[in-house]
């Protein structure tokens, strides 16, 4: 739950996610093909059943039809980083809105979306066919990539060079780099590839937790 956010918008988000998942679940991405998040989902309109949900804009919250679909693009991006698939287009928010409390993934590991300008596009440069499975579970948004051949490698995402940089105007920029590590099935590191460089204006005190402890 998010502080100061209308919980009806959160409930509406679940409806929006179910509609979008229905458009993506079962997608086959064959060798040489590229998928576009927005091409597959289409414009999220009230006529299609989408409801007002929360979106982030310029570091703040507002309600918009189809709001909440960034949660799905975040999941798909994170899933894809754990495969050999190629991310062709990905964007992230220019603002870091949430402190790290309860964070389970590195900062900057999501993919924001805004129809029709900010898309998430993924290309299959392998010789195998991939299938996307996504759904709204009982408590979580769930997803996986399935592949037509037995996997010969596994993947992990690690964070490097994480910094909170003070700026001349009094605020902070949060920076990090994400790398995809490729291992063979015996656990030997085969490669480490840069996949994202993130910079975002922080919308909270970078020393929030320390301040609370001192208080």
Named regions from a protein language model:
Residues 1-215:
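Well-ordered beta-sheet/strand-loop patches within structured domains
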């Amino acid at each position: 739950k998010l502080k100061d956010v209308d919980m009806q918008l959160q409930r509406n988000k679940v409806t929006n996610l179910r509609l979008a998942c229905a458009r993506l679940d079962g997608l086959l991405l064959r060798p040489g093909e590229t998928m576009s998040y927005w091409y597959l989902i289409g414009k999220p309109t009230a006529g299609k059943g989408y409801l007002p949900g929360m979106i982030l804009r310029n570091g703040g919250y507002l309600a918009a039809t189809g709001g909440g679909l960034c949660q799905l693009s975040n999941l798909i991006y994170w899933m894809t980083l754990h495969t050999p698939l190629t991310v062709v287009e990905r964007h992230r928010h220019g603002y870091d809105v949430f402190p790290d409390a309860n964070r389970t993934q590195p900062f900057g590991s999501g993919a924001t979306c805004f129809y029709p300008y900010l898309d998430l596009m993924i290309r299959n440069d392998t010789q195998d066919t991939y299938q996307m499975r996504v759904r709204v579970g009982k408590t979580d948004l769930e997803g996986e990539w399935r592949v037509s051949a037995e996997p010969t490698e596994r993947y992990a995402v690690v964070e490097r060079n994480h910094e909170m940089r003070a700026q001349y105007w009094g605020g902070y920029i949060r920076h990090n780099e994400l790398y995809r590590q490729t291992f063979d099935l015996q656990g030997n590191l085969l490669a480490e590839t840069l996949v994202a460089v993130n910079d975002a204006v922080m919308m909270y005190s970078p020393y929030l937790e320390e301040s609370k402890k001192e208080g």
